[in-house]
Amino acid sequence: MKTFVFHIFIFALVAFASASRDSAKKIGSQYEHYATCLTENDAAADDIFTILDITSGHHKNENEHDKQHKNGCVMHCLLEKDGLMTGADYHEEKIREDYIKETGAQPGDKRLEALDTCMNETKDMTDKCDKSLLLVACVLIAEDSLATSTEASTEA
């Protein structure tokens, strides 16, 4: 029993350390075209929100409008270069396929439901930059919320 509890503790510690490390990452920085998209949008890495900025809601600060738009344009560039968007239009099936590959989500996974909800909530937006940032933010916030609720249910 002690060994089982110890393994659970180690698993939780590794998950926490991984989440903390990931939260400091700049959104989109793990993708191949990140540097190109920064250059194409006259952005520096310091201009880009971290995952924590998004999940904590800091990106919604009214004083951050220019930064929000710049972040959105970088996200749009990444999505377009990966074939997930053309202009302001999503390629929904391709987005789902790539998301499944990246996350390992299976049918019925709440993350897929969240992705669909996020696409539906933003699909009618016409500004491609704002639309891209809101999609990415929506997905990151949903993933964070789902992870938090999963952690809470395993602790109970």
UniProtKB/Swiss-Prot annotation:
Keywords: Behavior, Disulfide bond, Pheromone response, Pheromone-binding, Secreted, Signal, Transport
Annotated Gene Ontology cellular component terms: extracellular space
SUPFAM superfamilies: Insect pheromone/odorant-binding proteins
Signal peptide annotation: 1-19
One MF annotation (Gene Ontology) recorded for this entry: pheromone binding
One Gene Ontology term from the biological process aspect of the record: response to pheromone
TM region positions: none
Quaternary structure and interacting proteins, as annotated: Homodimer.
Family: Belongs to the PBP/GOBP family.
Protein name as catalogued: Pheromone-binding protein Gp-9
Species, as recorded: Solenopsis globularia littoralis (Fire ant)
Top-level taxonomy: Eukaryota, Metazoa, Ecdysozoa, Arthropoda, Hexapoda
